[in-house]
Amino acid sequence: MQRFMFSRVVEHQRQISRGFLSLVPSLSPTAVPAMSRFFPKITASDSTSSIPFFTPDFINPKKTLEESLNNLEGLTCNQAEREMYLFPQINQQRLLNTTGSRFGQVLGTWQFRCTILPARVNRVREVHETSNNEKKQQKQKSSVNEKKPKKKKKSSISDIPRRTKFQKHHRGRINKGVSSQGYICSRYALQTLEPAWITSRQIEAGRRAMTRNIGRGLTVRVHIFADKPVTVRPPETRMGRGKGAPAFWVAVVKPGKIIYEMGGVSEKVAREAISIAASKLPAKTKFIISK
């Protein structure tokens, strides 16, 4: 069918339609044979008929035809086919490349056999299987994204060191000495009274409890950092086969060490916030006010 439609176009390419000539106004009484350089297949019967006379010097057939075909949306297929016969060199590219055509306006395809041009074919064209598959994939992706758990917000400070010289440390002993770093920069502070190992999670839990109670705009200083890895082996394992894998990080704290400090609030608010932070720690502590 496609070859047949193209053969019809080739056969009628050199023929002239009276409808096209009727679009051109008569400008002078010159005979039609003067157009022989544009239309070499014109016959003598056409020159003696009642077609209006005009000269080729005052008319641009390409421009005239384009002005008459500015709006192609309302044309039917029969009219479009007739316009192809009138001036194929102009209308062929226009009809094939009209916006709204998915596969191109090729003669013999289902789009060209439709009763309207491609600008309106988009509204009534068939639903392809590919579009259905794409919709299914989008639904599956959306359902997967909904099931994903929400990511936890990162804390303002790092809980563990980013890089260490050695991956595993010796366990060591808990010293009973007194800390020499007991200075305070702010008004209120929390001081330890016994040696302990404070994990990174406990340090972060105490800091968050203080910041929530004192409100925004005020800072809480943390004087300790969990820099020692603690290894743990699974239960009921035999002797040997190396040291266990690092399980958590701790900060070694001696008596008299300052853990948190803050300022800019009243004593009542500071005491309440620090008491909540002290309940998160595994060691005995006391509330300090600097003079």
From Swiss-Prot:
Predominant location: mitochondrion
Ranges that cross the membrane: none
The keyword Ribonucleoprotein is assigned to this record: yes
GO CC terms: mitochondrion; ribonucleoprotein complex; ribosome
Biased composition (Basic residues): 163-173
UniProt xrefs under Gene3D superfamilies: Aspartate Aminotransferase, domain 1 (3.90.1150.10), Ribosomal protein L10e/L16 (3.90.1170.10)
Annotated GO MF terms: rRNA binding; structural constituent of ribosome
Basic and acidic residues bias locations: 127-137
Annotated GO biological process: translation
Cellular compartments annotated: Mitochondrion
Region of interest called Disordered, as start-end residue ranges on this chain: 127-173
Range annotated as the organelle transit peptide: 1-27
Alphabetized SUPFAM superfamilies for the sequence: Ribosomal protein L16p/L10e (SSF54686)
The keyword Cytoplasm appears for this protein: no
Keywords: Mitochondrion, Ribonucleoprotein, Ribosomal protein, Transit peptide
Function per UniProt: Could be a component of the large subunit of mitochondrial ribosome.
Family the entry assigns: Belongs to the universal ribosomal protein uL16 family.
UniProt name for this protein: Putative ribosomal protein uL16-like, mitochondrial
Annotated source species: Arabidopsis thaliana
